[in-house]
């Protein structure tokens, strides 16, 4: 397996570690969007969100919440925090090991989602809600 995050977890590659427990590792992003940008990575490999163990995923978010609070209290002193998970190449995922970004934010920092948000009709929203509920119900069986 040629996964850079698995190599970091195994200690085969260096990382500026911030947090380490039995399930996840938190470390500084090598290509930060902003100063203080961290990654929270499950130690068990999962290429994407669908493959992520539910307990690992829940723990990853709990740790990200703690790290976000620590970033706010640190000298980084951001005005806000984004938690960001890219799931799939088209969503911007570059390392195919599920992970959560903790991105400290300041006005004018240049980071953000560049989208044009629409105003769909209630009918269209209801249609998509039905489709997603159907898929959700099917996943329970």
What are these regions (language model features)?
Residues 1-141:
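HIT superfamily nucleotide-processing domains
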């Amino acid at each position: 397996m040629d996964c850079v995050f698995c190599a970091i977890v195994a200690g085969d590659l260096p990382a500026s570690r911030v947090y380490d427990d039995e399930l996840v590792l938190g470390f500084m992003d090598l290509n930060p969007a902003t100063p203080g940008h961290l990654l929270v990575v499950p130690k068990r490999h999962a290429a994407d969100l669908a493959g992520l163990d539910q307990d690992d995923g829940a723990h990853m978010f709990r740790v990200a919440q703690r790290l976000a609070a620590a970033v706010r209290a640190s000298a980084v002193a951001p005005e806000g925090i984004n938690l960001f998970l890219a799931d799939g190449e088209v969503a911007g995922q570059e390392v195919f090991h599920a992970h959560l970004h903790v991105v400290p934010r300041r006005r004018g920092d240049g980071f953000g989602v560049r989208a044009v948000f629409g105003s769909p009709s209630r009918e269209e929203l209801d249609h998509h809600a039905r489709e997603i509920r159907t898929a959700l119900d099917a996943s329970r069986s």
